[in-house]
Amino acid sequence: MFLITSRLASLVLCLAVGMLACMQVARAQSDDAVSIHGQVTYNWQKHDSFSDPRGAGTNSLTSSAGKMYTFTGTAFLGMRPWVDGELYFNPEVAQGVPFTGNLVGLGGFTNGEITRAAGTSPSLYRQRLFVRQTWNRGGGKETIEEGANQLSGSVDRNRVVLTAGNFSTLDVFDNNAYAKDPRTQFMNWGSWTYAAYDYAADSR
């Protein structure tokens, strides 16, 4: 069962206050100087009981009916601290419980968000913190649209971009429209962890 604990409520409130403060700063600056986005996702799943003639082993999915849930909330905050430079920070809060109470029993878990969760107590952590520097090299201009972890602006078609810090492999090397974000795309975590990478932890 999903419970809104006092600790979770406090974390969400602090996150909201921080975002509002950043929005006040954004109003005082140009449109492409600050970027603020947020996302909250709640995923609840269940399975009915099923026959298990051999009996459930230590690493098996229990045959009795079960349910699981995840809750995550993320702020996508960005700013332009200097010319052609960008700074991004993504604080995130997560909680959840998998089937059987641990991550066993399925070859590919049906909710990729469970990789972030650490039990019924919400955890606040730094999901991303990175800088991006662009060196324009001519060749005409093109417009970059504003979005989560992306400031709007005009850049040269020929450019060198350096990204450094804490971010996900999937942010750069697997930008597909189907299986890189369990919040909005296919949820099975095999699609973007061990089924796609030798070392699955690189995808977080």
Residue ranges, per PLM feature:
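Bacterial N-terminal signal peptides
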Residues: 10-22
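Outer-membrane beta-barrel channels and translocator barrels
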Residues: 31, 80-84, 136-138, 157, ...
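Outer-envelope beta-barrel architecture signal
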Residues: 32-36, 83-89, 125-127, 156-160
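Residues on the lipid-exposed face of transmembrane beta-strands in outer-membrane beta-barrel proteins
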Residues: 38, 73-79, 129-133, 164
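Residue-level signature of outer-membrane beta-barrel architecture
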Residues: 42, 79-81, 91, 133-135, ...
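Surface-exposed strand-loop-strand hairpins of Gram-negative outer-membrane beta-barrel proteins
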Residues: 46-70, 176-180
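Repeated loop/turn-to-beta-strand initiation elements of outer-membrane beta-barrel proteins
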Residues: 48, 84-87, 137-142
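Surface-exposed coil loops of outer-membrane beta-barrel proteins
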Residues: 103-130, 138-204
